[in-house]
Regions:
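Metabolite-binding pocket within alpha/beta catalytic cores that recognizes anionic/polar moieties
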Residues: 4-124
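Zn-dependent metallopeptidase/amidohydrolase metal-coordination segment
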Residues: 178-216
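Generic hydrophobic/aromatic pocket-lining and core-packing "Φ" positions
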Residues: 71, 166, 181-184
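Flexible, glycine/proline-enriched loop segments at strand-loop-helix junctions
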Residues: 56-61, 118-131, 154-156, 170-174
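His/Asp/Glu-rich mid-to-C-terminal helical/loop segments that flank catalytic regions of hydrolases
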Residues: 205-240
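Active-site rim beta-loop-alpha module in soluble metabolic enzymes
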Residues: 128-171
């Protein structure tokens, strides 16, 4: 079992397409759980579980992901601590492609929040708990240097942002993606601790006058696959 500050813990991971291409979790048992929002497939080993947010069949684009089912599944399985890895574009020159950062806040204005409260008058201010991030950042160093307290800007997807959109949102945050804000919203409502890790696959469209080179983007995604495998290997060692 993983042990943190003297307490045994169970940790669930949420990741994306890089996990589908990884052999790291090939020996984990595939299971399914029913939720009020649909069935969720996940992988499990010991005290840990892994959800591929895009699914294990035909990968769902970001705007079609069943976020409520994914988070409800983890809550129903008894997990409290969630570590999420999200692919992002960098909005800052000082966060080059290949960087891993942790976000402590987010902006999600295009779609509005994800919520479980369709028939209840409930609200509250969502947070990214990041309760495991200090441990992970300290223990992953010096192999991984992970800047913290970054701001995640969420757009709907599945297309990349226009240059004009990037000019607007550069002042809003540090990285841009399509998934983390909804997960953080729902984890807050469900009482789960959401821990943010974000891996930059590219500079955002038009940053410093550049355009996205999709050939280079695909090559970097492949290169980042090795980094993702190593990151999860180390996290599993740290968390037990």
């Amino acid at each position: 079992m993983g042990k943190y500050l003297g307490h045994f813990m169970r940790v669930a991971f949420i990741s994306g397409t890089s996990i589908v291409n990884s052999t790291l979790f090939s020996s984990w048992e595939v299971r399914q759980v029913e939720t009020p929002y649909g069935r969720v497939a996940y992988k499990a080993r010991g005290d840990h579980a892994l959800i591929n947010r895009h699914g294990y069949g035909f990968p769902l684009p970001p705007h079609s992901i069943n976020y409520r089912a994914n988070i409800r599944a983890l809550a129903d399985l008894g997990f409290k601590d969630i570590v999420s890895l999200n692919s992002v574009g960098s909005l800052k020159p000082e966060i080059p492609p290949g960087s891993i950062v942790s976000c402590s806040d987010y902006v999600c204005l295009q779609q509005g929040p994800a919520t479980f409260f369709d028939t209840e008058l409930k609200g509250g201010a969502p947070v990214i708990a990041n309760n495991l991030i200090p441990l992970l950042v300290a223990r992953l160093a010096p192999e991984f240097t992970i800047p913290t307290a970054k701001v995640y800007v969420q757009m709907r997807g599945p297309r990349f942002e226009t240059k004009a959109e990037i000019r607007v949102v550069r002042a809003w945050g540090d990285v841009i993606g399509m998934t983390a804000a909804h997960e953080a919203d729902l984890c807050s409502e469900a009482g789960l601790n959401y821990n943010s890790l974000a891996l930059a696959d590219n500079y955002a469209n038009g940053l410093e006058g550049t355009e996205i080179d999709f050939a280079k983007f695909k090559d970097l995604v492949k290169t980042n696959q090795e980094k993702v495998n190593r990151l999860f290997t180390r996290m599993l060692e740290i968390l037990g």
